Structures are given as C-alpha cells and as structure tokens.
Amino acid sequence: MTEITGPNRPQPKPVSLDPAKTAVVVLDLNARCHDPEEVCSQLMEPLGGFLERVREASVPVVFTISLQFKGTPLGDAAVPLKRRDTEPVLYPDAFDKFAGGELQAILSGAGTENLIVVGSLTNVAVLYTSTAAARVHRYNVIIPLDGVNAKSTYEHEYAIHQLGILPAGAGDLMRFTKLDMIEFNL
C-alpha cells in the first residue's frame, strides 16, 4: 500500500494567454461577499484588481450566482468586482455552472479555448465547474490559487488535488497559477 502524505500542492506557474481565446468565469461572488464573515469576502480586493486587468485586455467575463439568490438583494454580483452591464450574470441551479447550457453557449460563441476560473468555494462550484470545463468541454482551465477559496484549508487543498488528478486527460488541462502570474499576449 502506498503511504499518503496529503494532497498534491501544485506550484503556481506563469501563464501567458491569447485574450481572443480566453474568458473568465466568476463563480458565486454575489452580494453576500460584502459580509466580512463570509469566506468569499477575502477574494474581493485581489479579484477586483485582476478583473480590471482582464477587462483592459478585452477578455470576456461571465458571472454566475446560485439560483437561490435570483431576484433577491443577494442576487447581484459583489460591488467590489465592478461588474459591467455587458458582462452576463447566469443563475444556474447546480454546483456545475455549465448545467442548463447557458455558460457553454456564451463561451463557445466567444471562441473560448482557455477558461480562467475564479470564485468560491473551491470544493463546490470551482471543483464541479472546472471538472466539467476540462472533462466535458475540453477547455484549458486556468485556476489562480489566490483567486479561489474555501471555508477551510483542507477543503481548498483537497479540491485542488482532485482537479490535478482528473482522469481521461482532464487533469492535464488544468493549469495552476496566481493572479499576478497571468499575462495576456496583446
């Protein structure tokens, strides 16, 4: 039996992307993230700056928010992320934000090959959406480790481990980086 010492912890590597073939999906960062008690609140500052860089490179941004919040005060994207009116908000009723087909239609219509996944929780929406992106839709999935989070280190690291070992070649489509290590070839 192999001794298990813990999940793999991928080292972040620089990523250079063609903005014309790249999109960003922002998972479950809605108005509840204004509450400092919510773990997602920790992502507001770093992702706010990152999304400004993304927009300067003309990379499409798509927001997803859980269906339970649609039509409520928590149904809006978190204010610090400065969502533009041109950036769609989808309300899928699943952890996998590809459920229902809207996200895939937007991404394929934009000619997306590279999908940057940010948001919360790593062990829920990030894990399920990234898995579908790689395994089902065959996107190159870029996960900035400082652009996703979970309620505990264990949950975060376990989900990252799972993404790195996906079967059928899907794990090979995962690239782990940091927000400031992502460059766009302009």
Show where each model-derived region lies.
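Active-site-adjacent betaalpha module
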Residues: 2-23, 71-186
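Short acidic, Gly/Ser-rich segments with clustered Asp/Glu that frequently serve as metal-coordination loops
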Residues: 30-36
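Von Willebrand factor
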Residues: 51-70
